[in-house]
């Protein structure tokens, strides 16, 4: 049976890493769209649009078409938000992983290999707002290789790296729609610290919430 190997990133991994990141982020579009539909303002717009057109046109078809168009526009808004984030990330740290993570102090980027194929990624670097912590970033595993313990192995790699360098904790940020990630982090001992809206206009419009988690390494060591 093939084994999982966690190793440091190499330049030849670049395209695979970008693909894993892009596909992983794109998976959250459907759940984010459903999150948007559950928001009271969205439901009010849909209801008012339907009722207003039904009353004014005396036709059932027109309001149905109008609501369909509003839903399509809402989904495109979600797609735009994720595509913008993906594009920004690919142009920033993921465009120069070696320079961003491997050549900087207390930073690193790892990939997970399964049967010689890169199927997962994770990284960490110092957090600007929490000097005593390293921040876990870019955690992603191919859909075809989930439920195999790869994500846990990647998270443990970051925790060990952080502990070895004398930092007190690992922090990370995930979104309210990433329920599987939340379950994983909480299972591994991370505690939810706070929730906050994405500061951009679209994030506020969608009521898209980010969650900050923290793993206290001293307590984690005692529990183990």
Where are the regions a protein language model picked out?
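Conserved GNAT acetyl-CoA-binding A-motif
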Residues: 134, 155, 162-174
């Amino acid at each position: 049976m093939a084994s999982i190997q966690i190793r440091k990133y190499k330049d030849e991994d670049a395209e695979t890493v970008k693909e894993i990141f892009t596909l992983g982020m794109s998976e959250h579009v459907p759940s984010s769209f459903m999150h948007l539909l559950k928001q009271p303002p969205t439901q009010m717009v849909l209801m008012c649009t339907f009722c207003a057109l039904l009353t004014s046109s005396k036709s059932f078809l027109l309001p149905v078409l109008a609501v369909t168009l509003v839903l399509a526009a809402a989904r495109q808004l979600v797609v735009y938000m994720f595509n913008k984030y993906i594009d920004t990330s690919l142009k920033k740290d993921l465009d120069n992983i070696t320079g961003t993570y491997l050549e900087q102090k207390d930073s690193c980027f790892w990939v997970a290999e399964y049967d010689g194929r890169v199927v997962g990624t994770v990284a960490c670097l110092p957090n600007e707002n929490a000097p005593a912590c390293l921040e876990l970033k870019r955690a992603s595993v191919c859909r075809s290789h989930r439920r195999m313990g790869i994500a846990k192995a990647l998270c443990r790699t970051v925790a060990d790296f952080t502990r070895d360098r004398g930092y007190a904790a690992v922090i990370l940020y995930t979104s309210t729609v990433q329920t599987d990630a939340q379950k994983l982090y909480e299972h591994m001992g991370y505690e939810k610290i706070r929730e906050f809206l994405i500061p951009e206009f679209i994030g506020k419009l969608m009521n898209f919430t980010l969650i900050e988690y923290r793993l206290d390494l001293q307590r984690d060591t005692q529990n183990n």
